[in-house]
């Protein structure tokens, strides 16, 4: 199995509901962290943002989120990401405690990046999320810009992408690994994959020009692909829609 592929633990979650956890240390990179939790109704978790800015994305389900500055009650608007409507998210700066109570079955993504900033805690509502259709032919996808580079954050960039069966995305192939480029934005990326129907899969390749990195992975529901550098296209299979 590729070292870039983190298999889902959704069938055997930790007692706190954790099914994925990517840190800079485990990924052997500098910045990005990603966690996924599957919480049962009434289950509660407390998070410490520590030295990171953190965005909590309600991938599916409803919750109340309590922070030091605000309480966001009864947020969440979709039972599945495949409803294809923008989600609710909450942005929290570093050195904050956050309490989350699930009000239904909850799929919660926790996205982190190092930060010493003090940007305000804020609710990102569905109407705040930019929606765009990209591509043509068999290269079409729907994008939800939850926290794009045009919005206020120190380092985080968060999007959802929906790719229909038999299409490619993150294509034409492109990369984000040159810190000194005038044309590239340096990014480390985590792709959290979901499929409809859930037994589906996709193929994702991560490779560099010189092929010193060249990994092609069969990715299943709940898996995470880590992209430290290089090109990273995704190809869906007929009959299975993809979300990441």
Q: At which residue positions do the language-model features occur?
A:
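Sequence termini and other peripheral, non-core segments
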Residues: 1-9, 14-16, 21-24, 46-55
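A short glycine-rich, His/Asp/Glu-containing loop-to-beta-strand
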Residues: 14-46, 139-190
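Extended, compositionally biased flexible segments
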Residues: 26, 33-101
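Conserved hydrophobic/aromatic beta-strand scaffold that supports enzyme active sites
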Residues: 34-38, 55, 89-91, 110, ...
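Glycine- and acidic-residue-biased ligand/ion/polar-headgroup-sensing regions
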Residues: 50-74, 165, 177-223, 235, ...
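Conserved metal-binding segment of the jelly-roll/cupin
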Residues: 83-97, 101-103, 113, 218-239
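Surface-exposed beta-loop interaction hotspot
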Residues: 104-165
